[in-house]
C-alpha cells in the first residue's frame, strides 16, 4: 500500500503542477485588442508599418495589390510586391487536421487575423519609410515553383529609383528547408552615398492562447541576444513595455504550439531587437540591422534569414545555435533534452512513436529498478517493525521526545531508513514532468500514429481506452499491495477510490503520455512480483 501511495503522490503532484500552471494562465491580465476595420480579404501594409531609426512602430491595414506566388517542396508562400512582405505561408507536408489534406497555414492575412513577415530598408536613404511609403517592386512573373531538378529557387523583386539606384530584393528557397534567405542587392549608380539599414519584423493580431489544462500552450513572442540566450516576451509584456535590446546577432520570433516564425539577422552584425503593440491590436517583434554606407558607383548586399515552419530542433540549430530553444521544455530542460534524444534514437530504430515511448518507459524503469527494489525492501522492513512501533506508542504514550529517540534507535538497530521509500519518488517526478514536456513540445509527435485506433499520440485517446486500461492497472497495483494494520480505515477507503479519480484525470491527457503511464504501471506490477518473491525468501512480507 505504501508503494501505491507513492505512485499516487507522484500523480497528485503532477496534476497539482498542471492546475497551478493553468491558474497562472487563466488569471494573467489579458491584453486588450482594439478593433479595426478591414476593407479587403487580403491586405497589405502602408508606410506606417515601417519602424523608424528610433524603433517606433505603428501599423495600419489597407487594400492590397496582386501577390507573387511561390511553391516549393515544403512551402507555399505569397509575397506582396508592395514592400516585399511575406503575407502567406502554408506548410505543404503538415496538415491542418489529421484526416484532411489541407496544408497547415502559419502566416496569413484575412479580415479578422493578420500574421505576416515584413522587411525593408530604412535609414537616411531607405526606400521604406513612414513618410514616403513602402517600396513598390516589380518582378518578371507572378508565379515561381521549385522544379524537380532544382535544389534552390530565387525570386527577385526589382526597384529602380528616380536617381538610378537599383534595388533587388531576392528571396532564396532551398529544397527540404523552411528557412528563406532575404537579400537586398543595392547597386548605387548615383553620385551620392547611401545610408541604409535593414529591418525585419513579424506582425501578428493579438489572439488568446488556446489550450487545455492538460495541454497548456504558449502563443506569443520570444527573442535571443548576446546576453539572453532565450526569453519569452508575451503579449502582456509587449503591451507593458516596448523591447529594445542591442546585440551581436540574435533573433526575434513568434511562437505557437509546434510552429515558429523567426527573423535571424547576421550573427556578426550589430543589431537591435525591438517590439511594440500598435493600434489595431497588432503585436510586432523584429530586428533593426547594422547601418551600411554605400558609396557612389559601388554595390552592397544586405541580408537576413527568415524561418517559417515546425519547431524542428535540428533545422533550427543549423540556423542559430540558440534558435532551437524555442522548443521550451521548462525548468527541467536539462533532463528533457536527453530524454528527447533517446526517444529520437528509439523512433529511428522502430519507426513508430508509440513503440518508441514504450521503449523509453522500459529504459527509465530499468534504470530506476535498483532504487525501486531498495524502496520495496525498506517498506517491507518498516511493515515488520509495526508491532514494535505499536508497543513503543503504548509504552511512551504522549512523551514524543522519548518515543522519537526510541524509534531512531530501533531504526539504527534494524538498519532501516524510514525515508528509504522517498528517493524513487523524488527521481520519478522530475522524469515524468520532463517526459510530459517532451511529448507536449516535440512537433514530431503531432499526428504521429501508434496502432489501431490511436492515430495521433499528441491528443487524447478518442475512445478513452488507454485511460481506462491505466485505471485498471492502478487498481491491480493496489490489490497487490499489503495493507498496513495501523492504516486508518478512512485512508484505506480513499486509496481505493484513487484509481477512479486518476482515470478521470487522464481522460484528457495526450495519448502518448497515458501510454507511458500505462506501460510504467505494467512494468511496476512485474517488478513488484519479482521483488516480493525475493523478499518472501528473506522472511520479509
UniProtKB/Swiss-Prot annotation:
Main localization of the protein described in the UniProt heading: membrane
Keyword Cell cycle assigned: no
One Gene Ontology term, aspect cellular component: plasma membrane
Intracellular or extracellular location(s): Cell inner membrane
Membrane topology note: Multi-pass membrane protein
Top-level lineage group: Bacteria
Gene Ontology MF annotations: membrane insertase activity
GO biological process: protein insertion into membrane; protein transport
One Pfam family it belongs to: YidC_periplas
Keyword field: Cell inner membrane, Cell membrane, Chaperone, Membrane, Protein transport, Transmembrane, Transmembrane helix, Transport
Residues passing through the membrane, by range: 6-26, 342-362, 420-440, 457-477, 500-520
Subunit organization: Interacts with the Sec translocase complex via SecD. Specifically interacts with transmembrane segments of nascent integral membrane proteins during membrane integration.
Role played: Required for the insertion and/or proper folding and/or complex formation of integral membrane proteins into the membrane. Involved in integration of membrane proteins that insert both dependently and independently of the Sec translocase complex, as well as at least some lipoproteins. Aids folding of multispanning membrane proteins.
Family from the record: Belongs to the OXA1/ALB3/YidC family. Type 1 subfamily.
Protein's name in the database: Membrane protein insertase YidC
Amino acid at each position: 500500500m505504501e508503494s501505491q501511495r507513492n505512485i499516487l503522490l507522484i500523480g497528485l503532484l503532477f496534476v497539482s503542477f498542471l492546475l497551478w500552471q493553468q491558474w497562472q494562465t487563466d488569471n494573467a491580465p489579458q491584453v486588450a485588442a482594439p478593433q479595426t476595420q478591414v476593407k479587403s480579404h487580403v491586405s497589405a501594409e502602408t508606410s506606417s508599418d515601417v519602424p523608424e531609426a528610433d524603433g517606433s512602430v505603428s501599423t495600419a491595414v489597407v487594400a492590397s495589390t496582386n501577390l507573387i506566388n511561390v511553391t516549393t517542396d515544403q512551402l507555399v508562400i505569397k509575397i506582396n510586391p508592395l514592400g516585399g512582405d511575406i503575407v502567406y505561408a502554408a506548410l505543404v507536408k503538415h496538415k491542418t487536421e489529421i484526416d484532411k489534406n489541407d496544408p497547415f497555414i502559419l502566416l496569413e492575412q484575412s479580415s479578422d487575423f493578420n500574421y505576416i513577415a515584413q522587411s525593408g530598408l530604412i535609414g537616411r536613404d531607405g526606400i521604406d519609410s513612414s513618410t514616403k511609403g513602402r517600396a513598390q517592386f516589380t518582378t518578371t512573373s507572378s508565379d515561381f515553383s521549385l522544379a524537380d531538378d532544382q535544389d534552390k529557387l530565387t525570386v527577385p523583386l526589382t526597384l529602380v529609383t528616380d536617381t538610378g539606384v537599383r534595388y533587388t530584393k531576392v528571396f532564396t528557397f532551398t529544397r527540404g528547408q523552411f528557412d528563406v534567405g532575404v537579400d537586398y542587392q543595392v547597386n548605387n549608380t548615383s553620385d551620392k552615398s547611401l545610408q541604409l539599414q535593414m529591418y525585419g519584423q513579424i506582425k501578428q493580431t493579438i489572439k488568446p492562447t488556446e489550450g487545455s489544462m492538460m495541454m497548456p500552450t504558449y502563443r506569443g513572442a520570444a527573442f535571443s541576444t548576446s546576453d539572453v540566450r532565450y526569453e519569452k516576451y508575451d503579449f502582456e509584456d509587449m503591451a507593458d513595455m516596448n523591447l529594445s535590446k542591442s546585440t551581436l546577432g540574435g533573433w526575434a520570433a513568434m511562437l505557437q504550439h509546434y510552429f515558429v516564425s523567426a527573423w535571424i539577422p547576421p550573427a556578426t552584425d550589430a543589431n537591435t531587437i525591438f517590439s511594440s503593440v500598435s493600434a489595431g491590436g497588432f503585436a510586432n517583434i523584429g530586428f533593426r540591422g547594422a547601418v551600411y554606407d554605400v558609396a557612389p558607383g559601388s554595390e552592397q548586399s544586405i541580408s537576413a534569414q527568415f524561418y517559417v515552419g515546425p519547431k524542428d530542433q535540428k533545422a533550427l540549430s543549423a540556423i542559430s545555435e540558440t534558435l532551437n530553444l524555442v522548443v521550451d521544455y521548462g525548468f527541467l530542460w536539462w533532463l528533457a533534452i536527453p530524454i528527447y534524444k533517446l526517444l529520437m534514437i528509439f523512433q529511428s530504430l522502430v519507426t513508430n512513436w508509440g513503440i518508441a515511448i514504450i521503449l523509453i518507459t522500459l529504459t527509465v524503469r530499468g534504470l530506476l529498478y535498483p532504487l525501486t527494489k531498495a524502496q520495496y525492501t525498506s517498506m517491507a522492513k518498516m511493515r515488520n517493525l509495526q508491532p514494535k512501533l505499536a508497543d513503543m506508542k503504548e509504552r511512551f504514550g504522549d512523551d514524543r521526545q522519548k518515543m522519537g529517540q526510541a524509534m531512531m534507535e530501533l531504526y539504527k538497530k534494524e538498519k532501516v531508513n524510514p525515508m528509504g521509500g522517498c528517493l524513487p519518488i523524488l527521481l520519478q517526478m522530475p522524469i515524468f514532468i520532463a517526459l510530459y514536456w517532451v511529448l507536449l513540445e516535440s512537433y514530431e509527435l503531432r499526428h504521429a500514429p501508434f496502432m489501431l485506433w490511436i492515430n495521433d499520440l499528441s491528443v487524447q485517446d478518442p475512445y478513452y481506452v488507454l485511460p481506462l486500461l491505466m485505471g485498471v492497472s492502478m487498481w491491480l497495483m493496489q490489490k497487490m499491495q499489503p495493507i498496513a494494520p495501523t492504516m486508518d480505515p478512512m485512508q484505506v477507503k480513499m486509496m481505493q477510490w484513487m484509481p477512479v479519480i486518476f482515470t478521470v484525470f487522464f481522460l484528457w491527457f495526450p495519448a502518448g503520455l497515458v501510454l507511458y503511464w500505462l506501460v510504467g504501471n505494467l512494468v511496476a506490477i512485474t517488478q513488484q512480483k519479482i521483488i516480493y518473491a525475493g523478499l518472501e525468501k528473506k522472511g520479509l512480507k
